[in-house]
Amino acid sequence: MRIVLITQITPASENVRGTSALPYHLMVHRPADVDIVIYSFNGNQLSDAKIKEVEKELNVTIKLLSRPTWQSWVLRLHLLFIRVLLKYPLFNYMWLSSKVVEEIEGLQPDGIWVYGQDISRVTKQFGGFKRVHTLPDSESLYYYRMLGRRFVFKNWMMFMRNMVMYPKYLRMESVYENSPTVKYHLVGESDAESLRNVNPGIQANFLRHPHYHVAEPQKRIAFSKPKIRLLVAGQNNLYMKEAAEEAFDMMLHEVDKLKECYKVTFLGRGWESMVTRLKNAGYDVAQITFAPDYIEEVCRHDVQLTPIAIGTGTKGKVLDALANGLLVVGTPFALENIAVENGVSCVEYRSNEELLSVLVDIPHNVQKYEQMAEKGREAIFVEHGRRRISQQLMDLFKQ
């Protein structure tokens, strides 16, 4: 089967200036009979050397596309305020030249795969083919959720951005092609449901997000002594800020119950003030702003605390932790769309009281939580395996 992938960004094994890892890992263990040619706008600006490396790793051919001249000038001159005047998001005004369309049609592909929610006009250029459009999230759902958070209203610029972008993405999603030959692929169940509500009758398919990297050999799950190693992975950005502040304020208030039980590590930027506050309170705490080998660093820990306040789709760092044997303790947004079960293969908390209860309980019932971490890892290997998800994606072309 021959597939042509048309993408905003060039795939790479890691996220490079965009979500480039998802298409890479959807292809790396694809069925042996699937041949893929990639046409990329290279919005993430991968170097020629890196592109050749990806071609070799994925056994694909990558051809670069030119961005519309006017968009290049908008980006070069920092004229992004122009987005406010547009009916749709800026990158929705991208399509292929007739010459490129003819070239792709000449390859006689069995299907056209489009990656990136904004380039839906490209999907419409191949009406005679079976098409799968990987979004992978619903941007309108993201802005809808953002407008429901209190912290957004405290920042005038953030509020205005969300107010401007929400209707643009709603309009864009409402005019996605809705025909039997186009299937939309999302990595969020709520995202797929949201798209069906915005565009009734559209074929929106939820597929689990593939996990990325697993340490070899696999980590033996045995919590550290005398202190359990607790990891907080990711930047202290707007996705985590609200829930993280609530969680660590609780830990500061309950310092006598927790400080002798945990060694806390922040892996990411923006946590400096929190590190200082926890240290001053008596916690054993460290910060690593950059790890040369991210997975190796993750594997040094036992529990990952993921206090995510907002977001859509699937959280890659949660998948990384689960796949590498950590017990994940997180909010509903942290664990949504992941094939784990609260109290069986992860711990989901909805309040500071629930978080405190589990953090107090873990040191007293270590074996119970080690088994939970093992079940979490098993669930990810089965339900989020790259080979499995790639096969499911390719099967969409056959339906």
What are these regions (language model features)?
Residues W73-K87, H133-R171:
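Acceptor-binding helix/loop patch of EC 2.4 sugar-transfer enzymes
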Residues K317-D320, L327-T331:
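Short hydrophobic beta-strand element within catalytic cores of glycosyltransferases
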Residues V344-E353, D361-V366:
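Conserved acidic donor-binding segment of nucleotide-sugar-dependent glycosyltransferases
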Residues H25-L26, S98-E105, E139, F151-Y184:
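Membrane-proximal helix-turn-helix segments that form the acceptor-binding/catalytic region
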Residues M1-T61, L252-K257:
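N-terminal subdomain of nucleotide-sugar transferases
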Residues H364-K398:
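A charged, aromatic-enriched C-terminal amphipathic alpha-helix characteristic of glycosyltransferases
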